[in-house]
Amino acid sequence: MGAHLIDGKAIAQQLRERIAQEVADLKAHRGLVPGLAVVLVGEDAASQVYVGSKEKMAVAVGMHSVVCRLAATTSEAEVLAKVEALNADPTIDGILVQLPLPAHIDEDKILLAIDPDKDVDGFHPVNVGRLSIGQSNGEHGMVPCTPKGCLMLLKGVLGDLTGKTALVIGRSNIVGKPMAQLLLSANCTVTLAHSRSRDLPDLCRRMDIVVAAVGRPEMVKGDWLKPGAVVIDVGMNRLPAAPGAEKGKLVGDVDYASAAAVAGAITPVPGGVGPMTIACLLANTLEACKARGAGA
């Protein structure tokens, strides 16, 4: 019997429906409309697609959506001024600066300029600190969207995570480190590994939960896994195109075929973690709006 398929697309849809209902209630009973602003600098094709998707989904759940499109030649000072204007705008609850930025703009400086209470990506050092000391836990606070979505998927399969052993493969500030912090807050016993960790297969075999976010195509094999483990594959890698094909196959960091034969539950790529990321961006924006209303 194969692993249970964790359908991130369907779960994200359910989350968006709950968000839409809460947005409607906020409008009806408190006169609040969550506002999400995305700052896009330049003409990067992938960024244009991502921003378009975020805008479409924000509008679909009833949010106020603003996309600030700036030319690639926009100066760092002008981008900072735009961020400061959005910080001061009472109709905007969430601010997201789409990365990457043009080479002449310091990404860290721009991200630091965002009001931490409007930092729906959860990348500001204040929010990183809140997560590390347990003030944020995936249900409260501005937590990076991909780890937040992964935690929701895990809880959907396992319920209470207390006492589970968990391995996070990957140490990025965007996924790996915050994922480990969230699992700690959920009372897991957590190991954080990376591509240079020794005896990685042996580590994996001892774990109830494996989160792969290392950026290496199909690195985690089925024989690395403990039977019945829950596997969350954050990877998104495009293999070289086969002769005559326009595009290569999209795969994760886990060898899906072999892993699905051993795991108890697993996310596919695509259709697993990816859809949860934008849904959690909307969830963070909603939470920021509710915090604004509470402080009014």
From Swiss-Prot:
One of its GO terms (molecular function) is methylenetetrahydrofolate dehydrogenase (NADP+) activity. GO terms for biological process: L-histidine biosynthetic process; methionine biosynthetic process; purine nucleotide biosynthetic process; tetrahydrofolate interconversion. Its EC number is 1.5.1.5, 3.5.4.9. Coiled coil: none annotated. Keywords: Amino-acid biosynthesis, Histidine biosynthesis, Hydrolase, Methionine biosynthesis, Multifunctional enzyme, NADP, One-carbon metabolism, Oxidoreductase, Purine biosynthesis. Belongs to the tetrahydrofolate dehydrogenase/cyclohydrolase family. This is Bifunctional protein FolD.
